[in-house]
A protein has these predicted regions:
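Hydrophobic residues within alpha-helical transmembrane segments
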Residues: 4-7, 34, 56-60, 86, ...
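Hydrophobic transmembrane alpha-helices of multi-pass small-molecule transport proteins
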Residues: 41-44, 54-73
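Helix-coil boundary and interhelical linker segments in multi-pass alpha-helical membrane proteins
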Residues: 1, 42-55, 104-111
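Alpha-helical transmembrane segments of compact multi-pass small-molecule transporters, enriched
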Residues: 31-45, 121-125
Length: 140
């Protein structure tokens, strides 16, 4: 369970970094904002808990606010919209699942065991990225 959550953390980071590196920030950030709606959706789906209308409205308003705050000049074309939407959206799904699965599985494990294990597995999985580094770690 902690390995799954740690994997979601690493996958979400990779996907959202990809969206920012290859795409347009003004497109990526509003896509990241859908995480709030996805958490509400996965809460009903995975935790089988009802989410009230007030929370759904708040989630949708949050996405709208993030979108409005990240408007760009209409004269500038967006870069790589497809990869931005895909990787940003998948990253948001990973982070939303991370949030919901922490709520679901932590009571059985206890916070003192679950959180350190999540970050241990996240760090362990991150070592798989070392071959893809373009510069030595001391340059970072």
């Amino acid at each position: 369970m902690p390995a799954v959550i740690g994997g979601l953390l690493v996958a979400g980071q990779l996907l959202q970094f990809l969206a920012l590196e290859r795409g347009d920030v003004s497109v990526a950030v509003p896509v990241f904002g859908i995480k709030v709606v996805l958490v509400a959706f996965f809460t009903t789906l995975i935790l089988a808990e009802s989410v009230g209308a007030r929370l759904w409205i708040a989630a949708v308003l949050s996405v709208a606010a993030v979108t409005c705050l990240n408007r760009r000049d209409a004269n500038q074309p967006s870069r790589h919209v497809g990869i931005t939407l895909l990787s940003g959206g998948l990253g948001s799904i990973c982070f939303a699942l991370f949030d919901v699965l922490v709520q679901k599985w932590t009571p059985a494990w206890g916070i003192g065991r679950m959180v350190p294990l999540i970050f241990f597995f996240g760090a362990l999985l991150s070592f798989a990225l070392v071959p893809f580094f373009r510069a030595p770690l001391r340059k970072i």
